[in-house]
Amino acid sequence: MSIQTIRLSALALAATMVAACYQVPQSTAASGQAGEIFASDQAAGSVIVVDKIGMPSTGWLVVHAVQNGEPDLSGAIGHAYVSAGPSSNLSVPLTTALPAGSEAVVMLHLDTGNAKVFEFANGAVEVLDGPVLRDGKPVMQKIALR
């Protein structure tokens, strides 16, 4: 079993534990349902712009890299704090610019640890700010960078 598989298994376990404690509201927000994300393919660079989200509570809009066609959920390459409810035209600064031809995943995360402190460290066993789940799956969208 590879270290990547172990990390993904740990993330899945953490997401399940978060889901057991927190249910995404099913009510419809003004610009979409809570626990939704809409992002378009965009120009490569050091910022990702997300068209709109519906966030069930305050939390994080997170960018994960894509490796070999799969999201690399072992860490984040960018994050921005977001308020509960609908938001649009959100910018997420990246720690490393992504080149043209690459892909990224934008994902909603809860703020369940220390308020306004992103606690989703690379390789962490305990994930405090885990993903928002809708129907048992992380709320995320893959985008291409051109």
Regions of interest found by a model, annotated:
Residues 22-24:
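Bacterial signal peptide processing site
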Residues 49-50, 86-97:
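Exposed aromatic-hydrophobic patches
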Residues 73-85:
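Solvent-exposed serine/threonine-rich low-complexity stretches and specific carbohydrate-binding patches
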Residues 109-125:
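Short acidic/polar inter-strand loop motif in beta-rich domains
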